[in-house]
A protein has these predicted regions:
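Conserved catalytic motifs of ABC-family nucleotide-binding domains
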Residues: 735-812
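Active-site-adjacent bridging/hinge elements
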Residues: 35, 103-107, 264-268, 287-291, ...
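Conserved ATP-driven helicase/translocase motor core recognized via long
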Residues: 26, 56, 158-307, 401-403, ...
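Conserved motor-region signature of P-loop NTPase helicases/translocases
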Residues: 1-76, 127, 131, 138, ...
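Conserved ATP-dependent motor core of P-loop NTPases, especially the RecA-like helicase ATPase domain
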Residues: 16-20, 56-66, 71, 75-237, ...
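Anion-coordinating catalytic cores for phosphoryl-, nucleotidyl-, and glycosidic chemistry
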Residues: 512-513, 523, 528, 778, ...
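Conserved helicase/translocase P-loop NTPase motor core
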Residues: 95-102, 129, 222-225, 286-335, ...
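Core structural elements
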Residues: 93-104, 152-180, 288-291, 316, ...
Length: 921
């Protein structure tokens, strides 16, 4: 087997088969090709052969598509190397996702494990989880009065907005997901409780006595309230009365601000802990009912003979742990175990894989890139990758043959200037400013790559900042600016089909698409969980509900006739809804379903072409319901309406919409295949399908001429000549009422703050409204000006403080989310081959009645990115980036209002309404 074309690092990976191998593979470094060659080498005579056949190779990757790609590459390479016999065994090889591997093991041992061997895999457990919540609440909800005093049942916000929409149903769903993913299920969950201790708060108020008259008055009132609470019954109502009576004094010359802030932090810690302690019955009830939901969910799965992905991992782990014979069998079966996308695994998956890798894990090869770990929301733990790397590096440093680390840093995808752009942000600048990522794996450009930049006179590295205005105005300005840049590239000869906009989220995808179309550029939304929002998905939904129940016109016939499939307007609907009384001759109203099935229209509303066409298509279709497959009927209606023909004539956008129609029809066919001839059940199943996070339909647009819009996650593994990146820079702070933290032992600690508050009476009998209590409590934790922050937590919080734990969990969540955002930006930028545009924005807030640019480094990357890419000390309107070849226009400031940043003042220069810079034509 010829290895001469491989780089030295690739050759090391391919030929190192006798020890644990850790591969850190940068973006665009050809890792899939290298893994394929490694399998071939292990099968080749030159290696021994190291393996007797593909059945001794286990290759795990993150997605089904990636597994299919590796299988096809292995098959083609085997054929090319003359190993046709081995190529025939590819379909039976252990090349799959980890869930696919688990499913295969469980089916093979189903009877001895007490599992139905015909089990189905529940890809989206959301519906069944919701059903479990609904059943338990309807059956047992009345027994949990304390809980419903803390949280609304569903879909409500607490007074004052403190609940943030938190509800019993949403919390139960969160706890169910956490328990399902835990190694030991619900027993791994532990709710932290507070304690009632106001001694520290009393001491803090005593420290204010005698300083000023105001401070003394505030301290006396607070101490009296605390004394009354300590002497009385410890109830939530009495605690609220005490809490509302404690008003910290204002700082002054004699009462330093630092002392007041410490008092506020002490008060926040004391009252939050006391409230959690006195309300502990509510949080215990939350765990109790969540446990009941967990049991109900498991019973529902058992009744339906389904397992979710967490079950697959947990049951396989338990089977190998508890069955020595199985563990011995699988532990010696594979001579090669390779895990691709290792950065997207979690500890449970690693523990499971360790059963399969032989003594000391010698068979294991892990491949990944910590800088591309962007699936934390699915449970990925990037620290698992880092710990594994550190362990193998330590073994290698000791001269041991127990492990080896290899880095793939040659990037075959991107131009050197793009890689320099990435490095400037994440590794640091030539001027010595440190980058966003510690331990950054820098990539080297491949000298032999073909340059795909067609446009001339355009720098490959560009950025823009939209400042001020509302969130919507900034988004519109951003979209207009990106579209204008793409238009300029197209005018300079750059193919539009190679341009893509990568977004951190898709809520505004249509707004960006409209901006591209306004510039005369075709545009398709090709990736992201937006399928349910498309007109095509809604149109097919209306069709299937019409076929299921013609009389249900609200969700069926009315939207069907109004959509692009039939395009009826007001006159046509009036014709369907108007009849003539045969006896009196007077006109009267009729239901539109009756109008559809009747030919008797009133004078002046007869012979309307759109009505005639709708009747000609839908009447025969309705007559077929119950005789023919519903999916076939729906497909015929779509075709006979002429909709697909019309879409085909609308260019790339029309083809993309047609792909959505076909995806919807396929979903109906799949539902019908599972449910049989049951139109209403098929319609309900399609509704559930829409509730899932579905990407738009896809047609083969190779060589097309449209800008594509997709999420960064959808772009993973892809590459494009021209990339713009937007909505990838900021996060929301982690202020959810329920916070959690997973320990090293797998246990999950929880702290739940209340979502709503009762009214109470003060010591003098005055009525205290619940929303006033909520506003007071909101001051303590979670807000931008909260009284208890990490700055004071060490001074006021005891080691067992639930308030301190919630704060630490919240700040940890925010920090981890921002780190994930850094990695998301890295993935987005490394999709670019020739050109990369970063589109950022920042709000303007009032500081001392002056508008100031608001760059918050704790929740937004924008300020740090600007610091990396702008020349040191440069103004925001300087127009240049920090690179030597930069020229004016590479950076653009779109100021939607006047503002200040540092010592510089900036004047509004852009109008969103006009879509251009002020003064431009």
């Amino acid at each position: 087997m010829d290895l001469s074309t491989l780089m030295p690092q690739q050759r090391d990976i391919v030929t190192t088969l006798d020890r644990k191998l850790f591969v850190s593979a940068g973006a665009g470094s050809g890792k899939t090709f290298t893994l394929t060659r490694r399998i071939l080498w292990a099968l080749s005579p030159e290696s021994g052969p190291f393996v007797d056949g593909l059945d001794q190779v286990l290759a795990i990757t993150f997605t089904k598509d990636a597994a299919a790609e590796i299988r096809e590459r292995v098959r083609a390479a085997l054929v090319a190397e003359g190993m046709e016999r081995a190529a025939l065994s590819v379909d039976d090889a252990w090349i799959s996702t980890i869930h696919g591997m688990c499913s295969r093991i469980l089916r093979a041992h189903a009877l001895e494990l007490g599992i139905d061997p015909e089990f189905s895999v529940l890809e989206d457990p959301g519906d069944l989880m919701d059903l479990a919540v609904e059943r338990v609440l309807s059956r047992e909800g009345s027994a949990y009065g304390d809980l419903f005093g803390w949280y609304p049942l569903a879909g409500e916000s607490a007074p004052g907005g403190f609940g943030g929409g938190t509800s019993v149903t949403s919390l139960l769903r969160v706890l169910l997901e956490k328990a399902s993913a835990a190694r030991n299920g619900f027993s791994d969950l532990r709710m932290l409780q507070g304690s009632v201790n106001l001694d520290g708060l009393a001491d803090a108020y005593r420290g204010c006595m005698g300083i000023t008259a105001g401070a003394t008055k505030a301290a006396e009132a607070a101490l009296a309230a605390i004394e009354a609470f300590e002497a009385g019954e410890k109830t939530v109502g009495n605690l609220i009365a005490c809490m509302m009576a404690c008003k910290p004094p204002r700082s002054s010359k004699n009462l330093p601000k630092e002392q007041v802030n410490l008092l506020k932090a002490e008060q926040a810690d004391a009252f939050v802990n006391a409230y959690l302690a006195l309300g502990s019955r509510a949080t215990q009830q939350l765990l109790e009912i969540a446990h009941a939901v967990f049991d109900e969910y498991n019973q529902l799965k058992f009744d339906r003979s389904v397992l979710d992905n967490n079950d697959l991992l947990r049951l396989t782990y338990q089977a190998l742990r508890d069955n020595p014979a199985m563990r011995e069998d699988y532990g010696s079966r594979f001579k090669m175990v390779m895990i691709d996308e290792f950065q997207d695994t979690d500890q449970q998956q690693v523990d499971l894989i360790n059963f399969l890798t032989g003594e000391g894990g010698r068979a294991l090869c892990t491949v990944g890139d910590a800088q591309q770990s962007i699936y934390r929301f699915r449970g990925a733990e990037v620290d698992v990758f880092r710990r594994a790397q550190a362990q193998v590096e330590a073994a290698a440093a000791c001269g041991s043959d127990a492990g080896r680390v290899v880095q793939l840093v040659k990037n075959f995808r991107s131009h050197a200037e793009i890689l320099d752009y990435v490095a400037a942000i994440f590794d640091g600048t030539p001027q010595g400013r440190g980058g966003l990522m510690q331990g950054f794996l820098n990539l080297q450009a491949h000298d032999g790559r073909k340059d795909g930049m067609v446009a001339t006179g355009v720098n490959r590295r560009q950025a823009l900042l939209v400042a001020g205005g509302s969130t919507q105005e900034r988004a519109q300005a951003r979209a207009q600016a990106i579209a204008r840049r793409f238009r300029e590239l197209a005018d300079a000869g750059q193919p539009v089909g190679g341009m893509v906009l990568l977004l951190g989220g898709m809520p505004r995808a249509n707004m960006y698409a409209d901006a591209f179309r306004a510039q005369g550029l075709d545009c398709v939304i090709s990736g992201g969980s937006v399928f349910a929002q498309t007109q095509e998905a809604a149109a097919v939904r209306a069709l299937v509900w019409t076929l299921a129940n013609l009389a249900d016109t609200a969700q069926g016939l009315a939207p069907l006739l109004a959509c692009d499939m039939f395009s009826l307007g007001a006159q046509e609907f009036l014709a369907l809804a108007t009849a003539k009384d045969e006896q009196t001759g007077e006109t009267r109203r009729r239901n539109i379903d009756a109008g559809l099935m009747s030919d008797k229209d009133v004078d002046g509303l007869r012979d309307l072409p759109l009505v005639d066409r709708a009747r000609a298509v839908l009447r025969p279709a309705l007559s077929r319901v119950g005789r023919d497959p519903l999916a076939a009927i729906a497909r015929d209606v779509v075709n006979q309406s002429g909709w697909m023909v019309r879409l085909a004539g609308q260019g790339a956008e029309g083809r993309a919409r047609a792909a959505n129609v076909l995806k919807a029809l396929d979903a109906i066919a799949e539902a019908e295949a599972q449910l049989g001839a049951a139109p209403r059940q098929v319609a309900l199943a399609y509704d559930r399908f829409l509730e899932g996070k579905q990407a738009p339909g896809a047609l083969n647009e190779e060589g097309g001429n449209a800008v594509r819009i997709m999420t960064v996650h959808a772009s993973k593994g892809l590459e494009f000549p021209v990339v713009a990146v937007a909505e990838c820079f900021s996060i929301k702070s982690g202020n959810a009422k329920l916070q959690s933290l997973r320990g090293d032992d797998g246990s999950i600690s929880l702290v739940a703050l209340p979502g709503q508050f009762p009214s109470a009476r003060s010591a003098d009998g005055a009525y205290i409204k619940g929303d006033d209590v909520a506003k007071e409590f909101k001051k303590y934790l979670g807000g931008s000006s909260a009284w208890l922050t990490s700055e004071y937590a060490d001074d006021v919080c005891a080691s067992d403080s639930a308030a301190g734990a919630w704060l630490a969990m919240s700040e940890c969540e925010t920090r981890l989310e921002l780190q994930e955002r850094e990695r998301l930006l890295y993935v987005a930028m490394t999709r670019a081959r020739e050109y990369c545009l970063l589109a950022m924005d920042a709000p303007v807030r009032s500081v001392n009645k002056q508008p100031v640019l608001d760059l918050r480094d704790d929740t937004d990357l924008t300020g740090r990115v600007l610091e990396q890419i702008l020349p040191a000390g440069a103004a925001l309107n300087g127009g240049m980036l920090c690179f030597e070849d930069s020229r004016r226009g590479d950076f653009e400031l779109l100021a939607l209002q006047d503002f200040a940043c540092g010592d510089a003042a900036y004047t509004q220069n852009y109008s969103v309404e006009d879509g251009c810079f002020i003064g431009e034509d």
